[in-house]
C-alpha cells in the first residue's frame, strides 16, 4: 500500500496464506504515514527472502513497513517518524513465518527436512529503523514491536480450522 499522506483505514479483513519473496507476506506498507489497521486477522503468511533486494535475510511476514521515501518525508511535519508507522489495534497476528535464503533453499519456514526452528515474525519495520506499537491485539511474538500490557502474546487464538500453504524451493 502506497497511500501518500492521505488517511487510510484497513479493517475487518482476513489476510491469510500469502507468500512474499521479500517482506510483508500479508501486508506491506510503503509511503503510507496515515494508516489505521484494526480488527484484522493476519495469519500464516510467509516471507522467503528470495527477492534480489532481500539479501537473503528474514523480514516481517505478517505486516511490514519500511522507510518513507525522501519525497514523502519532505511533505510531513518534522516530528513525523521516518517510516510508515500505522495505528495498530484489535488485530490477531499468528503463525507468520520469516524465512532466510540459504544456498538453494529457504530456512525457518517449516520446509520438510529443514533442521532450523520456524522463525515467527508477525510485524515490524523491514529495515530495522523503528518499532511498531500494536495495542489490544493477539500476537505470537513481539519481535519488531514496543511491548504493551494490552496485548495477548503467545496464546493460540484457536481458530476453527487452519490451512498450511505448501512451499517448495526449486534448485
Map each language-model feature to its residues.
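Predominantly extracellular beta-rich ligand-binding scaffolds that present long acidic/polar faces
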Residues: 7-171
Amino acid at each position: 500500500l502506497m497511500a501518500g499522506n492521505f488517511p487510510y483505514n484497513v479493517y475487518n479483513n482476513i489476510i491469510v496464506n500469502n507468500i512474499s519473496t521479500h517482506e510483508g507476506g500479508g501486508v506491506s506498507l510503503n509511503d503510507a504515514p496515515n494508516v489505521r489497521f484494526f480488527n484484522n486477522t493476519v495469519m500464516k503468511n510467509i516471507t522467503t527472502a528470495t527477492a534480489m533486494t532481500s539479501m537473503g535475510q528474514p523480514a516481517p511476514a505478517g505486516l511490514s513497513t519500511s522507510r518513507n521515501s525522501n519525497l514523502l518525508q519532505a511533505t510531513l511535519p518534522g516530528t513525523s517518524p521516518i517510516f510508515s508507522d500505522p495505528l495498530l489495534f484489535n488485530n490477531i497476528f499468528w503463525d507468520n513465518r520469516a524465512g532466510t535464503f540459504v544456498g538453494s533453499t529457504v530456512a525457518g519456514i517449516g520446509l520438510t527436512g529443514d533442521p532450523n526452528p520456524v522463525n515467527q515474525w508477525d510485524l515490524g519495520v523491514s529495515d530495522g529503523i523503528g518499532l511498531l506499537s500494536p495495542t489490544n491485539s493477539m500476537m505470537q511474538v513481539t519481535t519488531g514491536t514496543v511491548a504493551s500490557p494490552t496485548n495477548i502474546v503467545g496464546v493460540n487464538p484457536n481458530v476453527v480450522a487452519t490451512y498450511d500453504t505448501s512451499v517448495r524451493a526449486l534448485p
